[in-house]
């Protein structure tokens, strides 16, 4: 896994023990999963809007910035759920060489 993701995962874990007023991430953890998910939803919308704008303007700086926010808040969510980014990377690795249609067909049906 990239050094950046490892370092970020370590910081996110440290922030779980921090006082809510000591950092943005600590405050998110303190507010709970619903607040983290709300923020993740906001970042998703901002990323979509930035992508649409970039398609027209050909300026990709905002979509890169917003995607970084989206990834960051996704990592906060995973950390809050006790999951490490490596689990996502492992899943992506598992999908290499597997067609998207085959992967979707192989999933267990949701209840």
From Swiss-Prot:
It catalyses: 1-(5-phospho-beta-D-ribosyl)-ATP + H2O = 1-(5-phospho-beta-D-ribosyl)-5'-AMP + diphosphate + H(+). Its EC number is 3.6.1.31. It is found in: Cytoplasm. Pathway: Amino-acid biosynthesis; L-histidine biosynthesis; L-histidine from 5-phospho-alpha-D-ribose 1-diphosphate: step 2/9. The keyword Amino-acid biosynthesis applies. One of its GO terms (molecular function) is phosphoribosyl-ATP diphosphatase activity. It comes from the Bacteria. GO terms for biological process: L-histidine biosynthetic process. The keyword Amino-acid biosynthesis applies. GO terms for cellular component: cytoplasm. Keywords: Amino-acid biosynthesis, ATP-binding, Cytoplasm, Histidine biosynthesis, Hydrolase, Nucleotide-binding. PANTHER family: HISTIDINE BIOSYNTHESIS BIFUNCTIONAL PROTEIN, HISTIDINE BIOSYNTHESIS BIFUNCTIONAL PROTEIN HISIE. Belongs to the PRA-PH family. This is Phosphoribosyl-ATP pyrophosphatase. The gene is hisE.
């Amino acid at each position: 896994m990239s050094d950046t993701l490892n370092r970020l995962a370590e910081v996110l874990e440290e922030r779980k023990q921090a006082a809510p007023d000591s950092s943005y991430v600590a405050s998110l953890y303190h507010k709970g999963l619903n607040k983290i998910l709300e923020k993740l939803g906001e970042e998703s919308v901002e990323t979509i809007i930035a992508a649409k704008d970039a398609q027209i303007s050909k300026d990709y700086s905002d979509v890169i910035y917003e995607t970084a926010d989206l990834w960051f808040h996704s990592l906060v969510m995973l950390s809050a759920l006790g999951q490490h980014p490596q689990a996502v990377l492992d899943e992506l690795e598992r999908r290499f060489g597997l067609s998207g249609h085959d992967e979707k067909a192989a999933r267990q049906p949701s209840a």
